[in-house]
Regions:
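Non-catalytic signal-transmission and effector/linker regions of two-component phosphorelay proteins
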Residues: 1-7, 112-126
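Two-component/phosphorelay signaling modules centered on CheY-like receiver
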Residues: 15-33
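Residue-level signal for the "D+5" position in two-component response regulator receiver
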Residues: 34, 59-62
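Acidic catalytic/metal-coordinating carboxylates
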Residues: 37, 63-66
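Active-site beta3 strand of CheY-like receiver
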Residues: 48-54, 59
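Short amphipathic alpha-helix used as the core "switch/output" element in two-component signaling
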Residues: 65-76, 96
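Alpha4 helix (beta4-alpha4-beta5 surface) of REC/receiver domains from two-component response regulators
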Residues: 66, 87-105, 114, 118
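Hydrophobic/aromatic residues positioned on beta-strands within the core alpha/beta folds
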Residues: 83-85
Length: 126
């Protein structure tokens, strides 16, 4: 189901985190494209059709949930996974974002490799 041209967006202000996620994505059979802030991410959506997105919740320009809102306007069906150490799974903000469909899933930092692979298989391999 995954083709070598399918690309997953990673947005995190920590270059190391982008590198880690991009490597997991590549080893899962997809291409990864990274952005260090929301502005870069929005610019990347102009010329790319992403299969899914991993977003940090805290970015230097806007927060990850606001970026998710902007991405939703461009692609209502894009699977969006928030990856965060700031929020927890049972945080009301995250629960609301999941309930309303703003985000598709949540992964807490620090994460383990299998959590990311599982999200990729579930949401990008469609």
């Amino acid at each position: 189901m995954n083709d070598k041209y399918a690309t997953i967006l990673v947005v995190d202000d920590e270059p190391e985190m982008c590198w880690i996620l991009e490597n997991i994505i590549r080893k899962s059979g997809f291409n990864g494209m990274t952005a260090l802030n929301a502005s870069e991410a929005i610019a990347l959506t102009e010329n790319n059709n992403f299969r899914m997105a991993f977003l940090d919740s805290k970015l230097p320009d806007i927060d990850g949930l606001e970026l998710a809102r902007q991405l939703r306007k461009r692609n209502a069906h894009l699977p969006i996974v928030i990856v965060s150490a700031y929020f927890y799974q049972d945080d009301l903000t995250i629960e609301d974002a999941l309930k309303t469909g703003l985000i598709t899933a949540f992964v807490n930092k620090p994460f383990n490799h299998d959590e990311i692979v599982s999200a990729i298989i579930r949401y990008a391999s469609r």
